[in-house]
């Protein structure tokens, strides 16, 4: 609704604004990767909303990328629970999803995933920043790849591509794409020495 209103205020017809806004929001939040218009030319408000939606991702259990909606819900509920515990120290409340309590181990694993995601994200943005491109390009390039979105903003917008990056930056982006598609930990496990040691031991 906000994007539609912003586009209408930018002299776009309501029907076209609603169609483009609905399609781009749906495409980004489901990590489809399509673009029917150069949304990089939209207002700062629209672009900010689209960037935020890049991190939400698809539903739990789907093949879409991103952090997944369920993880965000658990994260918000965890923050609310911690805030309430400061206000009411003696209260005992459990985090619930669909009316069922979530085990502490599940909450811990989600928190670890989100922390790992942010570490990889920040490290990737820092790694490709040495080429001297603007922050919007670097930030959305990593956001678009690690969340399997497709196009980003600025130099990696819908009308552009990632071909101008150096080979090193492309390797970083490739890693982010694999991490976003395969999930973080299955990919990181491949780099653990114990996995390779066990593999070579079995061959011998």
Enumerate the predicted regions with their spans.
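Membrane-proximal intracellular helices of multi-pass ion channels
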Residues: 1-204
């Amino acid at each position: 609704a906000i994007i539609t209103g912003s586009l209408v205020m930018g002299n776009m017809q309501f029907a076209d604004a609603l169609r483009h806004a609905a399609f781009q929001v749906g495409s980004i939040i489901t990590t489809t990767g399509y673009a029917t218009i150069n949304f990089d030319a939209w207002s700062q408000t629209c672009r900010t909303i689209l960037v935020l939606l890049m991190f939400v991702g698809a539903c739990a259990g789907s093949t879409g990328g991103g952090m997944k909606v369920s993880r965000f819900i658990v994260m918000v509920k965890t923050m609310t629970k911690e805030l309430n515990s400061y206000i009411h120290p003696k209260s005992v409340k459990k985090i619930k999803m669909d009316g069922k309590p979530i085990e502490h181990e599940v909450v811990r694993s989600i928190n670890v995933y989100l922390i790992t995601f942010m570490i990889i994200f920040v490290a990737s943005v820092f790694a490709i920043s040495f080429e001297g491109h603007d922050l919007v390009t670097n930030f959305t390039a990593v956001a678009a790849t690690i969340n399997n979105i497709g196009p980003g903003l600025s130099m990696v917008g819908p009308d552009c591509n990632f071909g101008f990056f150096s080979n090193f930056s492309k390797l970083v982006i490739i890693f982010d794409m694999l991490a976003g598609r395969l999930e973080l930990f299955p990919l990181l496990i491949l780099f653990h020495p114990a996995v390779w040691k066990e593999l070579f031991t079995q061959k011998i």
